[in-house]
Structure formats: C-alpha cells, structure tokens
Amino acid sequence: MKVAVLGAAGGIGQALSLLLKTQLPAGSELSLYDVAPVVPGVAVDLSHIPTDVKVTGFGKDDLASALVGSDIVLIPAGVPRKPGMDRSDLFNMNAGIVKNLVQGVADNCPNACVGIITNPVNTTVPIAAEVLKKAGCYDKRKLFGVTTLDVIRSEAFVGELRGLNPENVNVPVIGGHSGTTILPLLSQVEGVEFTEQEIKDLTHRIQNAGTEVVEAKAGGGSATLSMGQAAARFALSLLKGLQGQDTIECTYVEGPGDNAKFFAQPVRLGKNGAEEILSYGKLSAFEQKCMDEMLDGLKGDIQTGIDFAS
C-alpha cells in the first residue's frame, strides 16, 4: 500500500508522517509532499526510524511523482489557525490549496481514497468533490473529511470526567467539523450517565477544543499533535478496510442527504472505501435540538464549497 501525505512539512503533516512511519504495515510506501523546502529533510529524518516503511520526500514541482500509485492520499496542507481566527477564516487561504492538490489526485491517482484534513473541512470536502466530478473520477465512497479529532477529543474528555481509560470509551460524533456543527452523541456512551449540565458543558468543550489549544499555545500553533494522531487513526482504519478487514469510523462523507449533502456519521470502511453509511441511532432531546439549530449552518458551509469550485 502507498500512502501520500500532501502538506507533510507542517505541524500536522510531520506528526502524521511520524505515526504512519511507525504504524503502517511492513512493506508500505510513504510519500511526503510539500511546497516547503524542508520536506526532503523530513523524509530523511523519518528514514532513520527502523521500520519496513519506505519514505520518500517530494518538493513543490514533484506533486505528480508523489501521487502516482497512491492508494490513500491525506491532505493536511494549508494555513493553520491563529488566535482570534475560526475555521471559516481559513477558507480564503485554504480553498485554493485543496482545489489544486485534489486536481493533482485526479490527474495522477484517480482511484485513490482521499482524506481531507485541511480546514474548514465542512467546505473543503465539497470543493474536492466538485474537482473530482469535473475530472470524471468522483466516487463518493472514496472521499472523506477526517473528523476523527472530534471523536478522540470526546473520548479523552469523557474519560477524564469519569476517571475511565479513554481507550475503552466510544463516542460517536456526527454533523460537521467546526463549532456547533460538531455533535457528540453523549447519550450513546455505553455504561456512563451524565447530568444535563455535564452534557451541555462537555458538548461545548468538544465543540471549542480547537480554540482551547490555539489559545493555550499562545500564537505558537494549533492542534497539530492530536490532529496528527486522529488522522493516523483514520488512515490506518481505512487501510485495514481496503485490505478486507472492515472497520468503523465516524467521517464526513456524501451520504443519502437526509440531513445535509455531506454529513459525518459512523461509516463502515471496506475494500471500496465507504462501504456503508451506518445509522447514528436515536438522538436525545438535547442532541436533536443541537442538530436542528446547526443544519442550516452546515448546509451553508457546503454550498460555499460548491460555489467556490464552480
């Protein structure tokens, strides 16, 4: 299997690449691309880690070489959040980056599964879909918005609150990947009861966790390490699926459109990518209210992406 990371020299890209170098199955190839001149050095640095994963770095003129033969393409490229910015402020800078990189995917590895990490994911995934449609190679089973960070944060925060091992906590997170569009289904956490206030506080913390990190880093970065871990978890689950070992992850995909054209919910990953979009079950009254209040915003984010790509 060949995995390409586009934007591999950034904070997320380096963390993700390190995790993939240490966790991809033996015999895998890891292809690192970035416009930053440091990327060949990142590849050399990682090549000194003794795992049977071949790492190659590609500079800004070598996108085609980086992509050819890729099974999975992960795109964390773009400008990170700074204090005072929200994910939508990133749109003007990052939309064009995603559009160009996905065009590269269409030209060089049109059958690859693509995981979009670049924010705002609510909008960049629809942009990617439109680019792939125009190129005649769009398969909705193979395009994903990586929302796993919301899931791992939910698991960590629930574990912290209840003194549980977070590795044993499972929290489905549905909707989108910014602000109130992030909807953790805390009513579905097995074996744990929350008060109404705890649910409100936890939901708010999960929705604003990115800001918590940006402010804590005081201008020195955004959530790069946790996002790297989240992206690696998603990529490794997807890889297992492609190899015939079905896995389930929450991810932002084009679905039946019951709520919005693109929507994050549990998905069964298999040999063709998104094999089946699973039901997220019954919502509590609080969750349903949150859903009703956020859908218009999510639909607006999606339309912004479609309009940009057109």
Curated annotation (Swiss-Prot):
Gene3D superfamilies: Lactate dehydrogenase/glycoside hydrolase, family 4, C-terminal, NAD(P)-binding Rossmann-like Domain. NAD(+) binds at G7, A8, A9, G10, G11, I12, G13, D34, N94, I117, T118, N119, M227. GO terms for molecular function: L-malate dehydrogenase (NAD+) activity. Keywords: NAD, Oxidoreductase, Tricarboxylic acid cycle. GO terms for biological process: malate metabolic process; tricarboxylic acid cycle. The keyword Iron-sulfur does not apply. NCBIfam families: MDH_euk_gproteo (TIGR01772). This is Malate dehydrogenase. The gene is mdh.
